[in-house]
């Protein structure tokens, strides 16, 4: 699967945002257990430095979460790659992302040619993410709303990626998962969280698996402009 996006000259990057630096990040991800080549190619291609403040650009290709304002973060690249790899295993076409944030996770999914729907409760973050999607020529459908509700009008989804942690998986989101689909989400409180994958079998039965310990911001209700 070849990543699809339009790269402007400033997207290519120089110095600490150069292709060489991105390649080193991909090798670190590979060494850390990410095996799916489509995921690794998308991580190599999508310019993470465009999804953070310019002052932090020199750290864009470190394998660490970084602040994006409003008490939110852009996720650690390994976590983005692991979540992407997990949902690609069910060969999805249509994906729901809960928590647009900077737009980086959604951009990775869109670069893989998936039909992406993303919901963000913080209006300012969503406006910035939309500009980035347009800049990269990505057709990502986005909505300013309470992410815990999902986007049922366009469901069911082959895959659902949740980028903030709740004490338990949210029933309203599980209800929007198609038969054969997979939901990946962090579950837990401030002191302990796990990345959980939930798969709905052909018979409708639900199977859960814990993938890794993680740390995410909390999944909150309501909306902010």
UniProtKB/Swiss-Prot annotation:
MF GO annotations: protein-L-isoaspartate (D-aspartate) O-methyltransferase activity
Q: Which GO terms describe its biological process?
A: methylation; protein modification process; protein repair
Q: Quote the subcellular location field of this record.
A: Cytoplasm
Active site (UniProt):
75
Q: Which reaction does it catalyse?
A: [protein]-L-isoaspartate + S-adenosyl-L-methionine = [protein]-L-isoaspartate alpha-methyl ester + S-adenosyl-L-homocysteine
Its domain of life reads Bacteria
A Gene Ontology term for the protein's cellular component: cytoplasm
Q: Pfam families attached here?
A: PCMT
Instruction: Quote the SUPFAM superfamilies the UniProt record gives.
Output: S-adenosyl-L-methionine-dependent methyltransferases
Main subcellular localisation? cytoplasm
Say which enzyme class the record assigns: transferase
Alphabetized UniProt keyword annotations? Cytoplasm, Methyltransferase, S-adenosyl-L-methionine, Transferase
- According to its UniProt record, the EC number is 2.1.1.77
HAMAP family with a match to the protein in the record:
PIMT
Q: What does this protein do?
A: Catalyzes the methyl esterification of L-isoaspartyl residues in peptides and proteins that result from spontaneous decomposition of normal L-aspartyl and L-asparaginyl residues. It plays a role in the repair and/or degradation of damaged proteins.
- Which family does the entry's similarity section mention? Belongs to the methyltransferase superfamily. L-isoaspartyl/D-aspartyl protein methyltransferase family.
Entry protein name: Protein-L-isoaspartate O-methyltransferase
What is the organism of origin for this protein?
Xanthomonas axonopodis pv. citri (strain 306)
Annotated gene: pcm
């Amino acid at each position: 699967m070849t990543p699809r996006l339009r790269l402007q000259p400033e997207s290519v990057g120089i110095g600490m945002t150069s292709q060489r630096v991105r390649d080193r990040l991909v090798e670190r991800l590979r060494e850390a257990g990410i095996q799916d080549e489509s995921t690794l190619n998308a991580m190599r291609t999508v310019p993470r430095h465009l999804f953070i403040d310019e002052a932090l650009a020199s750290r864009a290709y470190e394998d660490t979460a970084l602040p994006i304002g409003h008490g939110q973060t852009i996720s650690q690249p390994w976590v983005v790659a692991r979540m992407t790899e997990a949902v690609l295993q069910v060969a999805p076409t249509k994906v729901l992302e809960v928590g647009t944030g900077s737009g980086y996770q959604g951009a990775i999914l869109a670069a893989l040619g998936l039909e992406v729907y993303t919901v963000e409760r913080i209006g300012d973050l969503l406006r910035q993410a939309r500009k980035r999607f347009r800049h990269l020529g990505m057709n990502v459908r986005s909505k300013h709303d309470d992410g815990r509700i999902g986007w049922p009008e366009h469901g069911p989804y082959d895959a659902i990626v949740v980028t903030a942690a709740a004490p338990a998986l949210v029933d309203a989101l599980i209800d929007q998962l198609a038969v054969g689909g997979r939901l990946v989400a962090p579950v837990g409180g401030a002191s302990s969280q796990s990345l959980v994958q939930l798969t709905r079998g052909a018979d409708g039965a639900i199977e859960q698996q814990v993938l890794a310990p993680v740390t995410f911001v909390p999944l909150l209700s309501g909306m902010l402009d």
